[in-house]
Amino acid sequence: MFHKLLNKSEILAYDKKYVNNYIINVENLSFFYSKEKVIDDISFQVKFGEIVTILGPNGGGKTTLIRILVGIYRNYIGVIKYAKNFIIGYLPQHFSVNSLIPMTVKYFLNSSYTKSKRKLKLSDVLKDINIEKILDRQMSEISHGELQLVLLARCLMLNPDIIILDEPVSCMDVNAKDSFYKLINKLISIYNLSVIMTSHDLHFVMSNSYRVICINRSIYCEGSPSEIVKNEKFLKMFSSYA
C-alpha cells in the first residue's frame, strides 16, 4: 500500500510538479471487502486539466475507487502517486445534514476548515458559484441541487488541484444536470482544475468528459467518448441504457 494523507504538507512529494506529466498515477490497484475482490488490478492516469468520468454498473467498484483515491479506504494493494503539493477537493455521493442542528449555509462553509487549511475565503468563490441567495438559509432546508453547489463551493475553498465527485448529479433534473456540468467546465479553466467523477448518465458523460474509464471491478474499456461508444465491451455492458 502506498498512500498519504491529503494534508498538503504530508502529501508524497516529487521533484517535478506532475508525475510523468500526470497529476495522478494509479498502478495495479486492487481492493478487498473481507475476501471479496471489488477492485481488480486497475491502472490509469489523470492529466492536468482533464475531466475523467468513471462509468460502470451498480456494485462495479466506482464508489470504492473514489474512496480509495481520497484516502477513506487505505488497506488496498497497489501504488497511487500524486503530484507534488497535491490537494484534493471531494464531493461525496451522500452528504447528510442533521435537521436538529441549526446551521446556515454561510456558517457551514466558513466553519468547514481551519484557517490554515482554507486557501480561499468564501467571498473568493462566491463570484464563481451563485449561492449568495441561500447563504442565510438553514442547511436542512436547501434542495439537493443547492446542496451540491454548496459542497462544490466548500471544495473550492481548499484551492484544490483536483475535484473528485461521486455521482454529483444523481438526483437532479435534466436542466440542473446541464447547468452543473457547464459550471464544472467553467471552474476547470478558472481554478486550473482536474476532475474525476462517477456517473450513470451516459448522455451527459459523453458530452462533458475528456476521457471515460469503464469499470466493473476491473477496467474493461477506456478512451475518449467517441472511442468508447464504438467499443464492443461498452456496448454490451450498457445496451440497456440505449
Curated annotation (Swiss-Prot):
<dbReference type="GO" id="GO:0005524">
    <property type="term" value="F:ATP binding"/>
</dbReference>
<comment type="subunit">
    <text>The complex is composed of two ATP-binding proteins (ZnuC), two transmembrane proteins (ZnuB) and a solute-binding protein (ZnuA).</text>
</comment>
<dbReference type="InterPro" id="IPR017871">
    <property type="entry name" value="ABC_transporter-like_CS"/>
</dbReference>
<keyword id="KW-0997">Cell inner membrane</keyword>
<keyword id="KW-0067">ATP-binding</keyword>
<dbReference type="InterPro" id="IPR003439">
    <property type="entry name" value="ABC_transporter-like_ATP-bd"/>
</dbReference>
<keyword id="KW-1003">Cell membrane</keyword>
<protein>
    <recommendedName>
        <fullName>Zinc import ATP-binding protein ZnuC</fullName>
        <ecNumber>7.2.2.20</ecNumber>
    </recommendedName>
</protein>
<dbReference type="Pfam" id="PF00005">
    <property type="entry name" value="ABC_tran"/>
</dbReference>
<comment type="similarity">
    <text>Belongs to the ABC transporter superfamily. Zinc importer (TC 3.A.1.15.5) family.</text>
</comment>
<keyword id="KW-1278">Translocase</keyword>
<dbReference type="GO" id="GO:0016887">
    <property type="term" value="F:ATP hydrolysis activity"/>
</dbReference>
<keyword id="KW-0547">Nucleotide-binding</keyword>
<dbReference type="InterPro" id="IPR050153">
    <property type="entry name" value="Metal_Ion_Import_ABC"/>
</dbReference>
<dbReference type="GO" id="GO:0015633">
    <property type="term" value="F:ABC-type zinc transporter activity"/>
</dbReference>
<feature type="domain" description="ABC transporter">
    <location>
        <begin position="24"/>
        <end position="241"/>
    </location>
</feature>
<keyword id="KW-0406">Ion transport</keyword>
<keyword id="KW-0864">Zinc transport</keyword>
<keyword id="KW-0472">Membrane</keyword>
<feature type="binding site">
    <location>
        <begin position="56"/>
        <end position="63"/>
    </location>
    <ligand>
        <name>ATP</name>
    </ligand>
</feature>
<dbReference type="InterPro" id="IPR003593">
    <property type="entry name" value="AAA+_ATPase"/>
</dbReference>
<keyword id="KW-0813">Transport</keyword>
<dbReference type="GO" id="GO:0005886">
    <property type="term" value="C:plasma membrane"/>
</dbReference>
<dbReference type="InterPro" id="IPR027417">
    <property type="entry name" value="P-loop_NTPase"/>
</dbReference>
<keyword id="KW-0862">Zinc</keyword>
<comment type="function">
    <text>Part of the ABC transporter complex ZnuABC involved in zinc import. Responsible for energy coupling to the transport system.</text>
</comment>
